[in-house]
């Protein structure tokens, strides 16, 4: 069996990790072992936080909608429930943007929800 020399492969693998670790502080960007650990940790955190970002934004939208709804005498759950009854299909992101950027339009939506209540 012939001998396999893997110097190039090993160097490329290590350089790939060190390239990903660029910008880390201290030995985390220069020494392969510590850089490898930090890159793995960073990739895990990035994956986890991409999922978490969706939850965080939904919480933010709900908080904004709730604050705007209470100015019109409704709670968040009443507003959402009444919008479903009135068959108004605005998602939470759009409602939150209306509440922040165009409060008058949000007021009209809230009025429609109040009418659907009774």
Swiss-Prot record:
Pfam families: Ribosomal_L20 (PF00453). One of its GO terms (biological process) is ribosomal large subunit assembly. InterPro entries: Ribosomal_bL20 (IPR005813), RIBOSOMAL_L20_CS (IPR049946), Ribosomal_protein_bL20_C (IPR035566). This is Large ribosomal subunit protein bL20. GO terms for molecular function: rRNA binding; structural constituent of ribosome. GO terms for cellular component: ribonucleoprotein complex; ribosome. Gene3D superfamilies: 6.10.160.10, Ribosomal protein L20. Belongs to the bacterial ribosomal protein bL20 family. Binds directly to 23S ribosomal RNA and is necessary for the in vitro assembly process of the 50S ribosomal subunit. It is not involved in the protein synthesizing functions of that subunit. Keywords: Ribonucleoprotein, Ribosomal protein, RNA-binding, rRNA-binding. It comes from Trichormus variabilis (strain ATCC 29413 / PCC 7937).
């Amino acid at each position: 069996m012939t001998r396999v020399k893997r110097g190039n492969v090993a160097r490329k693998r290590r350089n790939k990790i060190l390239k990903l670790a660029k910008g880390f502080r201290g030995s985390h960007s220069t020494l392969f072992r510590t850089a490898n650990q930090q890159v793995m940790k960073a990739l895990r955190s990035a994956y986890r936080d991409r999922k978490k970002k969706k939850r965080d934004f939904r919480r933010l939208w709900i908080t904004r909608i709730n604050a705007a709804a209470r100015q019109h005498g409704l709670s968040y759950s009443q507003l959402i429930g009444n919008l479903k009854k009135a068959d108004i299909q605005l998602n939470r992101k759009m409602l939150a943007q209306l509440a922040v950027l165009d409060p008058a339009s949000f007021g009209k939506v809230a009025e429609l929800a109040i009418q659907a209540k009774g």
